[in-house]
UniProtKB/Swiss-Prot annotation:
Gene3D superfamilies: 2.30.30.30. InterPro entries: KOW, Rib_uL2_dom2, Ribosomal_uL24_CS, Ribosomal_uL24_euk/arc, Ribosomal_uL24_KOW, Translation_prot_SH3-like_sf. The gene is rpl24. HAMAP family: Ribosomal_uL24_A. One of two assembly initiator proteins, it binds directly to the 5'-end of the 23S rRNA, where it nucleates assembly of the 50S subunit. This is Large ribosomal subunit protein uL24. The keyword Translocase does not apply. Belongs to the universal ribosomal protein uL24 family. CDD domains: KOW_RPL26. SMART domains: KOW (SM00739). Keywords: Ribonucleoprotein, Ribosomal protein, RNA-binding, rRNA-binding.
């Protein structure tokens, strides 16, 4: 998964052509200080069900559960971070995972627990 080139065009090309299993890893967000101390891991890929705090942008400070992870567009959708369209419907505002902090993990998946244990060392 290592990107060896420093050229911006090749960086962009890598992101554009990245396969889904690589995109999943690129959708990482930092953990809160409490979670970092508890699990000894600095960041993890965001998953549906994680509770996050938005750190940057118009919705800064807002907290909510992740409703959807869009690997194609490298965006996540958070409960409560919505826009009202002109026809009145509510749509989720797309947020890049680097702009959020995970404050509560969804640990229903046993594989995810094993990943955290393995990465903690």
């Amino acid at each position: 998964m290592k990107i060896s080139s420093k050229q911006p065009r090749k960086q962009r090309k890598f992101l554009y052509n990245a396969p889904l299993h690589v995109r999943q890893k690129l959708m990482s967000a930092p953990l809160s200080r409490e979670l970092r101390e508890k699990y000894k891991v600095r960041n993890l890929p965001v998953r549906v069900g994680d509770k996050v705090r938005i750190m940057r942008g118009d919705y800064k400070g807002h907290e909510g559960k992740v409703v959807e992870v869009d690997l194609k567009r490298y965006r996540i959708y958070v409960e409560g971070a919505t826009l009202r369209k002109t026809n009145g419907t509510e749509v989720f505002y797309p947020i890049h995972p680097s702009n959020v902090m995970i404050i509560e993990l969804n640990l229903e998946d046993e594989k995810r627990k094993k990943i955290i244990e393995r990465r903690a060392g």
